């Protein structure tokens, strides 16, 4: 299974003028890749993710997943937003099942499996208002992965969480990735998060958004953010931000 982003460009119309948001984005992922996308605010990271998800069909170029051209949402793509977007009137297990019936034994068993994977045992009958923000985001992760998507797209899913919760969810996500080998594309503003999670870091520049540099990250798992090798990768990423004039903008 491959994911191909081929020549993707995107324009927005603003009153009497047209603004280019993305310019000729090209990269490929193989099954089991974990790619993080990082860059200045406004460089089109989230727009690119929505295009890959099939949520935005007005663009130039092609998105090919497992040989199929993507023009709309499908089971091939799971998507996790910056906020969890749970239904407040549904329990944890009902939110994970979403439009599938828990009366179906297969669905019930799959939901139970994902409850265990994201470490929500004992909270199946709880409602969103009764659990923390971090737990709610774990529900969102389980919901997105229940249908076994070819690729999981994550748009800064931990950005609004405190440092301890974010660190915990990074471990949960890595555990899922190691177990399921789901291909992942993860948008973040956090350089350390990008290095900690992925095996490839795509650095984007802005106005219009384009790929500035792709850095391979071959650090073995589990990773330590205080290790010398981790800091060497961090230095490489920061050097690319400086060379591209990206460090002047908040990342």
Curated annotation (Swiss-Prot):
Which SUPFAM superfamilies does this entry report, sorted A to Z? P-loop containing nucleoside triphosphate hydrolases
Specify which residues bind ATP according to the UniProt entry for this protein: 39-46
Q: Where is the ABC transporter domain?
A: 3-231
Its keywords, alphabetically, are: ATP-binding, Cell membrane, Membrane, Nucleotide-binding, Translocase, Transport
Q: Where in the cell is it found?
A: Cell membrane
- List the GO cellular component terms: plasma membrane
The Enzyme Commission number assigned here is 7.6.2.14
Kindly indicate whether the keyword Cell cycle belongs to this entry: no
Q: Which Gene3D superfamilies match?
A: P-loop containing nucleotide triphosphate hydrolases
Q: Its Gene Ontology molecular function terms?
A: ATP binding; ATP hydrolysis activity
InterPro entries for this protein: AAA+_ATPase, ABC_transporter-like_ATP-bd, ABC_transporter-like_CS, ABC_transporter_ATP-bind, P-loop_NTPase
Q: How does it sit in the membrane?
A: Peripheral membrane protein
Query: Which reaction is catalysed here?
Result: ATP + H2O + aliphatic sulfonate-[sulfonate-binding protein]Side 1 = ADP + phosphate + aliphatic sulfonateSide 2 + [sulfonate-binding protein]Side 1
Q: Which coarse location class describes where this protein primarily resides?
A: membrane
Among Pfam families, the record links this protein to:
ABC_tran
Summary of subunit composition and partner proteins: The complex is composed of two ATP-binding proteins (SsuB), two transmembrane proteins (SsuC) and a solute-binding protein (SsuA).
Q: What does this protein do?
A: Part of the ABC transporter complex SsuABC involved in aliphatic sulfonates import. Responsible for energy coupling to the transport system.
Homology family = Belongs to the ABC transporter superfamily. Aliphatic sulfonates importer (TC 3.A.1.17.2) family.
What is the designated name of this protein? Aliphatic sulfonates import ATP-binding protein SsuB
> Which organism does this record belong to?
Bacillus cereus (strain ATCC 10987 / NRS 248)
Lineage per the UniProt record: Bacteria, Bacillati, Bacillota, Bacilli, Bacillales
Q: Which gene encodes it?
A: ssuB
């Amino acid at each position: 299974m491959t994911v191909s982003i081929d020549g993707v460009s995107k324009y927005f119309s603003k009153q009497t003028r047209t603004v280019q948001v993305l310019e000729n984005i090209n990269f490929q992922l193989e099954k089991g890749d974990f790619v993080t996308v990082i860059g200045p605010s406004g460089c089109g990271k989230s727009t690119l993710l929505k295009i890959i998800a099939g949520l935005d069909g007005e663009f130039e170029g092609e998105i090919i997943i497992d040989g199929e051209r993507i023009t709309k949402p499908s089971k091939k793509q799971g998507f996790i937003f910056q906020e969890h977007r749970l239904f407040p009137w549904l329990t944890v297990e009902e939110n994970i099942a979403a439009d599938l019936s828990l009366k179906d034994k297969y669905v019930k068993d799959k939901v139970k499996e994902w409850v265990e994977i994201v470490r929500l045992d004992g909270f199946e009958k709880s409602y969103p208002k009764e659990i923390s923000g971090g737990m709610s985001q774990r529900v969102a992760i389980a919901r997105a992965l229940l249908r076994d998507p070819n690729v999981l797209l994550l748009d800064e899913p931990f950005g609004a969480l405190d440092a301890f919760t974010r660190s915990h969810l990074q471990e949960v996500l890595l555990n899922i990735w190691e177990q399921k080998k789901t291909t992942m594309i993860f948008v973040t503003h956090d350089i350390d998060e990008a290095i900690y999670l992925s095996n490839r870091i795509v650095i984007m520049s802005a106005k219009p958004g384009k790929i500035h540099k792709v850095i391979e990250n071959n650090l073995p798992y589990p990773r330590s953010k205080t290790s010398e090798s981790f800091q060497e990768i961090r230095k490489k990423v920061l050097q690319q931000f400086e060379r591209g004039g990206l460090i002047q903008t908040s990342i």
